[in-house]
Regions:
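Sec-dependent N-terminal signal peptides
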Residues: 4-14
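Buried hydrophobic residues that stabilize the cores of well-folded domains
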Residues: 19-159
Length: 159
């Protein structure tokens, strides 16, 4: 009897977990299909002059708003040999998903015409906690909650 109860509990946990991921995927798809966002762009000058953050190929931050609610942040960081693009997705002002991609931008022959995707990692969140991480490639460990909050603050403060 205890064995059956344990199996039942385990199955209900797995089903609930899968439903959470499906709901997040649907919300991300909905955000990506949304048209007519109000977009706020923060150029590289802000990062260099205000935050004292200089990178070889610059930074750019974009906030995507619908009905005055932040739905997505896109953060581009250009380093010497690669670019990192991190996209943060929100529902009800809560981080739900982060897509972190790294592209090679320079080869031994110089700059690549089209940057080559090196990896794309997916991070799923619920109630400000990481619930699932899908890595194509092991990468640096980032505190995406903290980074998200810092970027939201930058969007709020930038005039």
């Amino acid at each position: 009897m205890k064995k059956h109860l344990l199996i039942l509990l385990l199955l209900s946990f797995i089903i609930g977990f899968s439903q959470n991921l499906d709901l997040i995927r649907k919300e991300v798809e909905k955000i990506n299909n949304t048209k007519n966002f109000k977009i706020k762009t923060i150029p590289n000058d802000y990062f260099v002059d205000i935050k004292n953050e200089a990178t070889d190929n610059g930074q750019e931050l974009k906030g995507y708003y619908k009905n005055n609610q932040l739905k997505k942040i896109s953060h581009f960081v250009g380093l010497s040999a690669w670019n990192i693009v991190t996209e943060y997705y929100y529902k009800d002002n809560q981080l739900i998903f982060v897509l972190n991609s790294k592209y090679q931008s320079v080869s031994e022959n110089g700059f690549l015409e089209k940057p080559k995707l090196l990896y794309r990692n997916r991070n799923y969140f619920k109630n400000n906690k990481l619930i699932k991480k899908i890595e194509e490639e092991t990468s640096e460990i980032f505190d995406f909650i903290k980074l998200s909050n810092e970027l939201k603050k930058d969007l709020k403060n930038y005039k």
